[in-house]
């Protein structure tokens, strides 16, 4: 369960709604996002980090297909290397690291505050030992607006931290303190990705995109400010945590917290908008990739729902999946989403 809706609530005396529903197959999506794509400036350093600190392994590596380079409207002579990494034993929640060569780049969310909008704010991991990861990641120059925060949430005691690392990439890391975490047998250092967050300027527009257009279902909803002033991982001034409302929806094709998308808005905190920068080859959390049953169905749905199609379906090799049909759309806050059908 992703706990962003209580990041700045030290007490559990707040109201929230979790949408409980029977899991029903989505007619188009085969699940939540399969992978997040990171555009990085030093791929070797990042492979070392995910191997040594996250305890992940390399699943595939090679050059980015020229068909994808062309679809991204990059110069014809552009080349890029990619490495796909994952938590050993898991079948989803991967990270695809891409290093574009000799291109002009800026960070998508450079020096961003948590309330700045546009692009993808963070991706979420579980960890076994927050203190261990806190120390290790500081040694790799990851920093944050706060140290890890421990708090109670109903029957749970958790620790949470939002570190920022190279290329402006932000993690949301969660350790379950009590009761012991169950159902994560492959968690040794850092788990697979299970959620990604967008901070949006217009929460209704974002809900319309994911719920009304793509047919995602609600996993969790929360509205309100903190019940007490104090420390928080979002970097809000302690005296304003009770004055700034947050509105949060966690959404997924079948309403679970596995490859889900979280949309978050702030009422009373306004910052910069990075929507125009959330495009290749810029640096940071570049996009999410979702598996679909039929690429033609999602393409047709995009047209019917007036979703901006960045490029239409095309056949391309994409390891470790093999031959796929791939397309891309633009979502709220300029977010780049790709959908693929596996043909193998």
Stretches with model-predicted labels:
Residues 1-5:
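Positively charged n-region of N-terminal signal peptides that target proteins for export
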Residues 6-15:
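Bacterial N-terminal signal peptides
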Residues 16-20:
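Sec/Tat signal peptide C-region and signal peptidase I cleavage site
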Residues 21-28, 38, 59-62, 83, ...:
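Vicinal oxygen chelate
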Residues 23-24, 28, 55, 59-99, ...:
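Post-signal peptide N-terminal segment of secreted/secretory-pathway proteins
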Residues 43-57, 136-139, 202-218, 304:
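Amphipathic alpha-helical segments
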Residues 64-79, 105, 224-241, 271, ...:
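Short, flexible, glycine-rich and Lys/Arg-enriched loop motifs at helix boundaries
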């Amino acid at each position: 369960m992703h706990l962003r809706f209580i990041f700045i609530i030290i007490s559990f005396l707040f109201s929230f709604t979790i949408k409980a529903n029977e899991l029903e197959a989505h007619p188009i999506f085969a699940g939540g996002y399969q992978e997040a794509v990171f555009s990085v400036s030093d791929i070797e350093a990042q492979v070392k980090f995910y191997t040594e600190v996250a305890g992940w392994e390399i699943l595939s590596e090679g050059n980015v297909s020229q068909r994808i380079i062309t679809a991204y409207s990059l110069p014809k002579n552009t080349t890029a290397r990619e490495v796909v990494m994952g938590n050993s034993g898991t079948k989803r929640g991967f990270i695809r690291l891409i290093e574009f060569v000799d291109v002009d780049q800026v960070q998508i969310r450079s020096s961003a505050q948590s309330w700045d909008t546009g692009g993808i704010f963070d991706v979420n991991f579980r960890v076994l030992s927050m203190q261990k990861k806190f120390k290790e990641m500081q040694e790799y120059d990851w920093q944050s607006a706060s140290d890890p925060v421990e708090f109670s949430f109903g029957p749970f005691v958790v620790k949470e931290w939002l570190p920022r690392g190279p290329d402006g990439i932000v993690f949301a890391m969660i350790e379950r303190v009590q009761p012991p975490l169950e159902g994560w047998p492959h968690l040794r250092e850092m788990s697979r990705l299970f959620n990604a967050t967008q901070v949006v300027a217009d929460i209704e527009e974002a809900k319309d995109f994911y719920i009304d257009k793509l047919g995602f279902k609600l996993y969790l909803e929360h509205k309100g400010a903190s019940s007490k002033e104090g420390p928080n991982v979002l970097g809000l001034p302690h005296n304003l945590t009770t004055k700034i409302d947050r509105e949060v929806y966690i959404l997924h094709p079948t309403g679970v917290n596995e490859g889900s998308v979280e949309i978050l808005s702030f009422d009373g905190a306004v910052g910069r908008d990075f929507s125009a920068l959330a495009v290749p080859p810029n640096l940071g959390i570049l996009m999410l990739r979702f598996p679909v049953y039929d690429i033609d169905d999602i393409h047709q749905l995009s047209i019917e729902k007036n979703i901006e199609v960045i490029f239409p379906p095309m056949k391309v090799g994409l390891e470790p999946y093999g031959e796929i049909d791939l397309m891309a759309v633009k979502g709220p806050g300029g977010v780049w989403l790709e959908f693929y059908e596996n043909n193998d």
